[in-house]
Amino acid sequence: MDPTSSSSSALRWKILRQALLRRSDSQSQTETKRISRKATQGFNLIPCQVVDSSPQSDKSREASVCYTLPITGSPKLYLTQRVDNCSDLNDFEISNRYNIDNTGLVCQWPSEEVLAYFCKSQPERFRGKRVIELGSGYGLAGLVIAAATEASEVVISDGNPQVVNYIKRNIETNSMAFGGTSVKAMELHWNQHQLSELTNTFDIIVASDCTFFKEFHKDLARTIKMLLKAKKASEALFFSPKRGDSLEKFMKEIKDIGLHYILTENYDAQVWKRHETLVKGDEAWPNYDKNHCYPLLIQITNQI
């Protein structure tokens, strides 16, 4: 075995151990920085800052983060989310019980920020539309769509019941920002075969970082086809890095189920500019790698 690969694997296990034990010693931090690709600010497209972190024991794992949208009026959204490195065994037990991943609890993933930024930049695309976000995590993109685009309805969904509870709280916190847009949270599992009240009802599906696990690809592709309007123009907008061959295999499932897709690498000037800066090296995102970190845009349609 390649000793470098073995060392990297050991350090990744150390990252997981830190998340469970909440270690923070300097030696461990130095070692894991060498292998971790975790970003401190993501693509830094939507300014954010922690505005509250309660010291009480029942709230010690949570923080309130303020996101200031870079649009006219600079509206703010407040999201309650987990602080870093605080996963516990209960999180993994729930993940196993529901046959889901718990990545939505880990952090605010960079592609979610890119999705949110892209959507707020194209309000006309969403105006008057029914929108659903899949695998939303804390719901940043869905909340941005609700606050900045005049969509008629936004459903923010995830398969993890713990995550859905966070979404509900975040919707309630920001309810005054949505104007006339109806916003709700939903626990949605991609292997559900009965979604009669949702079948063929959405104009737009959005999602980010949802294609990493190949075992979910077939169900995800089926869910997309089931949710999109079949007799009117509709689309799904996915943002995801290549991550080896995972994205390629997902797109094959999309094609096999009878949907069509367009893959775009450079879809926004500001995102691309930030990407080029990170490729050259930036301490805010150690070990940045295009294949692993840069989200491509996949536009999926029925092509009626």
From Swiss-Prot:
Coiled-coil features, chain-numbered ranges: none
GO term, biological process aspect, one: response to salt stress
UniProt KW Methyltransferase keyword: yes
Enzyme's top EC category: transferase
InterPro entries: CaM-Lys-N-MeTrfase, Methyltransf_16, SAM-dependent_MTases_sf
Effect of deleting the gene: Suppressed calmodulin (CaM) methylation, especially in roots. Longer roots with ectopic root hair cells in atrichoblast cell files and the presence of nonhair cells in trichoblast cell files. Increased number of epidermal cells in the root elongation zone. Reduced root growth inhibition mediated by auxins indole-3-acetic acid (IAA) and 2,4-dichlorophenoxyacetic acid (2,4-D). Reduced sensitivity to abscisic acid (ABA)-mediated stress leading to green cotyledons and normal germination in the presence of ABA.
Superkingdom field: Eukaryota
Catalyzed reactions per annotation: [calmodulin]-L-lysine + S-adenosyl-L-methionine = [calmodulin]-N(6)-methyl-L-lysine + S-adenosyl-L-homocysteine + H(+)
Subcellular location: Cytoplasm; Nucleus
Upregulating conditions: Induced by salt (NaCl) stress. Accumulates in response to osmotic stress (e.g. mannitol) and upon biotic stress, e.g. inoculation with the oomycete P.tabacina. Triggered by auxins indole-3-acetic acid (IAA) and 2,4-dichlorophenoxyacetic acid (2,4-D). Repressed by kinetin or abscisic acid (ABA) treatments.
Pfam families with a match to the protein in the record: Methyltransf_16
EC identifiers of the protein: 2.1.1.60
Tissues in which the UniProt entry reports expression: Expressed in discreet spatial and tissue-specific patterns including root tips, leaves-tips, floral buds, stamens, hydathodes, stigma, anther, siliques, apical meristems and germinating seeds. Also observed at high levels in the root stele region.
One term of GO molecular function: calmodulin-lysine N-methyltransferase activity
Record keywords: Abscisic acid signaling pathway, Auxin signaling pathway, Cytoplasm, Developmental protein, Methyltransferase, Nucleus, Transferase
Entry-linked PANTHER family: CALMODULIN-LYSINE N-METHYLTRANSFERASE
Family statement: Belongs to the class I-like SAM-binding methyltransferase superfamily. CLNMT methyltransferase family.
Function text: Catalyzes the trimethylation of calmodulin. Regulates roots development probably by modulating auxin signaling responses. May be involved in gravitropism. Involved in abscisic acid (ABA)-mediated and abiotic stress responses, including salt (NaCl), cold, drought and heat stresses.
Subunit structure: Monomer.
Name of the molecule in the record: Calmodulin-lysine N-methyltransferase
Organismal lineage: Eukaryota, Viridiplantae, Streptophyta, Embryophyta, Tracheophyta
